[in-house]
Amino acid sequence: MRYAGSENFTGRPITGYDAPVCLLTRDAVAALGRVQAKFSEFGLGLKVFDCYRPARAVADFAAWARDPADQKRKADYYPNIDKSRLFELGYIAERSGHSRGSTIDVTLVDVRSGEELDMGGPYDLFDKRSWPRAPEVAPQARANRMLLQDVMVANGFRPLKEEWWHFTLSQEPHPDSYFDFLIR
């Protein structure tokens, strides 16, 4: 879980992530089991970057985004965007579906090598290249994104238009809730 450590767009652990643990609703876990079973037919697996996100973590993201002085990870995570536009462009929000427990950030890996498949850009890159159908992404990376999206959608998830890695269970059990318990 990226936000339990410092390898993320803030460069530090995020409030609410006391452990690198993935928490999800039972419905999301069941759907992910079906996704993983399908990918295993191709020698692929899922790598999880983020699952449930406490509301206090979302507030931490928002506070970071409002601090114009903190630019230490700009080159890695938002090289082409002025930090002041992260809310406007939809990369940071005041509330997150992750706080409902049925949203997950994932990529594909080759199970033999453990290597991530080329997705045309890294996780959490705030850039149009992260859009699932970004035209500037190489054909193989776009095909990998579409494979991930197609299997996730076929198993009950819906994608986010700005992030190739982000999926929410369509029939999530807590659509109007935003939880704030710690990840331990």
PLM segments and residue spans:
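Extracytoplasmic cell-surface/polysaccharide-interacting catalytic and binding patches
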Residues: 1-51, 58-59, 63-162, 171-184
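Conserved metal-phosphate-binding beta-hairpin within the catalytic cores
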Residues: 167
